[in-house]
């Protein structure tokens, strides 16, 4: 059991992809005609021509996934042929493929008629006239999707040149994970010697078996292939960055991620140290891990919005209480002043009344004294008068 680096696909070599293209096309669903698809994948009573484009693509993806799963299952038991990469030129997945709204709602027959009418309106002759005579059942799925504009030729070429698949170039049964673009990372498990193959893009260092191995793309390959379009740089030049545990955590140690041990063990874990190298660094400098400088992320300032709101509410409540108390004191003071003024007025009225009463009592007493000094008047005695009323 050993670990080695496979750099066959780092330079973007398209010769191997072109060699595996016929085999890949023979095993792909997109090389089948609609009649063959109907006889192979079609359901009874349901024609592919009556399906919408969305439904057609969903059925193709389902069949492709099923084929890939069956191929993977069979590849574990028996090694595949040399250079066989099933699903290498597969269609883009639903997450990256968007159909036009007008095209997704049309059926396959309507799209086929529209393509024929469009070619007829352009006035093409010669070989195009022979192609227009071709029926939908004789048309391959790949040609139909290309003419409909669902699959671009650039995408198909990139998929054909991709090295991702379920069989490595050495013909051993295994499992390989790739990105679908040349010059990118791919990890494969070889079935013969149980080794791990890591196809890594230049510019990213890997720690394999406790050592750092750097893959650099030679400049001669770029000069030999000037006509090939270079893919965009996925891993730019980066500096060493170290992530350390926060200060408040109980475990304050740094965790490093390594890929030590056999290839069939669990690959890595949660790590706290991330190190990236640039294409300009030499392999001698990357033989061992450089001691990282820990960069501690602080907790940052906590949000005090809740506390500020509580303090603001208390201040507003205190201001309201003070204003209410001032208003109540003003009302009490005004009421007290009114009462005092009323008392003063009542006192004045009482004094006037007391003076009048004293004068009246004085005059009454003087009159009584004068009356008592006068002699009493004697009344005349009244006698009974004799009357002659009797008979005598």
From Swiss-Prot:
InterPro entries in the cross-refs: bZIP, BZIP46-like, bZIP_sf
Subcellular location: Nucleus
Induction section of the entry: Up-regulated by abscisic acid (ABA) and cold.
PTM text: Phosphorylated by CPK4, CPK11, SRK2D and SRK2I in vitro.
GO cellular component: nucleus
Region described as Leucine-zipper: 339-360
Annotated Pfam families: bZIP_1
Keywords of this entry: Abscisic acid signaling pathway, Activator, DNA-binding, Nucleus, Phosphoprotein, Transcription, Transcription regulation
Region (Disordered): 1-22, 266-297
Bias-annotated ranges (Polar residues): 274-291
Assembly and oligomerization: DNA-binding heterodimer. Interacts with ABI3 and the AFP proteins AFP1, AFP2, AFP3 and AFP4.
Known function: Binds to the ABA-responsive element (ABRE). Could participate in abscisic acid-regulated gene expression.
Xref: PANTHER family: ABSCISIC ACID-INSENSITIVE 5-LIKE PROTEIN 4, CAMP-RESPONSE ELEMENT BINDING PROTEIN-RELATED
Similarity comment text for this entry: Belongs to the bZIP family. ABI5 subfamily.
Protein name per UniProt: ABSCISIC ACID-INSENSITIVE 5-like protein 4
Species: Arabidopsis thaliana (Mouse-ear cress)
């Amino acid at each position: 059991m050993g670990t080695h680096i496979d750099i066959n696909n780092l330079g973007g070599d398209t010769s191997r992809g072109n060699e595996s293209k016929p085999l890949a096309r023979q095993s792909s669903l997109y090389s089948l005609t609609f009649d063959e698809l109907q006889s192979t994948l079609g359901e009874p009573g349901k024609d592919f021509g009556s399906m919408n484009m969305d439904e057609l693509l969903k059925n193709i993806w389902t069949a492709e996934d099923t084929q890939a799963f069956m191929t993977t299952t069979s590849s574990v038991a028996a090694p595949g042929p040399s250079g066989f990469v099933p699903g290498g030129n597969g269609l883009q997945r639903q997450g990256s493929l968007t159909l036009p709204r007008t095209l997704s709602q049309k059926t396959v027959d309507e799209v086929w008629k529209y393509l024929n009418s469009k070619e007829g309106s352009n006035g093409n002759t010669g070989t195009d006239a022979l192609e227009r005579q071709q029926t939908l059942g004789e048309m391959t799925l790949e040609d139909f999707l290309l003419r409909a504009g669902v699959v671009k030729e650039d995408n198909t070429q990139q998929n054909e040149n991709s090295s991702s698949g379920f069989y490595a170039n050495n013909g051993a049964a295994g499992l390989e994970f790739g990105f679908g673009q040349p010059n990118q990372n791919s990890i494969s498990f070889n079935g013969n010697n149980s080794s791990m193959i890591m196809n890594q893009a230049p510019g990213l260092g890997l720690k394999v078996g406790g050592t750092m191995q750097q893959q650099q793309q030679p400049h001669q390959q770029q000069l030999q292939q000037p006509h090939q379009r270079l893919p965009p740089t996925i891993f730019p030049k980066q500096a060493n960055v170290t992530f350390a545990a926060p200060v408040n955590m109980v475990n304050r140690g740094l965790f490093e991620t390594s890929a030590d041990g056999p290839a069939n063990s669990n690959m890595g874990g949660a790590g706290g140290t991330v190190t990236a190298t640039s294409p300009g660094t030499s392999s001698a400098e990357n033989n061992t891990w450089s001691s990282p400088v820990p960069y501690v992320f602080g907790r940052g300032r906590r949000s005090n919005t809740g506390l500020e709101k509580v303090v603001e509410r208390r201040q507003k409540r205190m201001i309201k209480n003070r204003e209410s108390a001032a208003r109540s004191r003003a009302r009490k003071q005004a009421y007290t002043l009114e009462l005092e003024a009323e008392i003063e007025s009542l006192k004045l009225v009482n004094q006037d009344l007391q003076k009048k009463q004293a004068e009246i009592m004085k005059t009454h007493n003087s009159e009584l004294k004068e009356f008592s000094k006068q002699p009493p008047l004697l009344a005349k005695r009244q006698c009974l008068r004799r009357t002659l009323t009797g008979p005598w």
